[in-house]
């Protein structure tokens, strides 16, 4: 069996040297949510731990302010 070589993903926030993740930046937050409304895990989106925590709190804050849906209806 051939082994697949996994490429390390680079945190997009670190690459752009962004210090904080804002809940107001909806276009960027929507990239990290599935079509069902769930937050993508770190191993899939490639964020570092620091920015994944900030991203999670920003998404949850945007949901509370009704900027993002909790779930997507069919």
Curated annotation (Swiss-Prot):
Any Pfam family hit: Ribosomal_S18
GO cellular component, one term: cytosolic small ribosomal subunit
The organism's place on the tree of life at top rank: Bacteria
The keyword rRNA-binding is assigned to this record: yes
One of the GO biological process terms: translation
Ribonucleoprotein listed as a keyword: yes
GO MF entries: small ribosomal subunit rRNA binding; structural constituent of ribosome
Keyword set, alphabetical order: Ribonucleoprotein, Ribosomal protein, RNA-binding, rRNA-binding
Family: Belongs to the bacterial ribosomal protein bS18 family.
Function: Binds as a heterodimer with protein bS6 to the central domain of the 16S rRNA, where it helps stabilize the platform of the 30S subunit.
Record text on subunit structure and interactions: Part of the 30S ribosomal subunit. Forms a tight heterodimer with protein bS6.
Protein name per UniProt: Small ribosomal subunit protein bS18
Native source organism of the sequence: Natranaerobius thermophilus (strain ATCC BAA-1301 / DSM 18059 / JW/NM-WN-LF)
């Amino acid at each position: 069996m051939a082994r697949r070589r996994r490429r390390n993903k680079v945190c997009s926030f670190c690459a752009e040297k962004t210090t904080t993740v804002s809940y107001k930046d909806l276009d960027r937050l929507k990239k990290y949510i599935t079509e069902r409304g769930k937050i993508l895990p770190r191993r899939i989106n490639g964020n570092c731990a620091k920015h994944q925590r900030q991203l999670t709190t920003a998404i949850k804050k945007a949901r509370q302010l009704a900027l993002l849906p909790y779930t997507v209806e069919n």
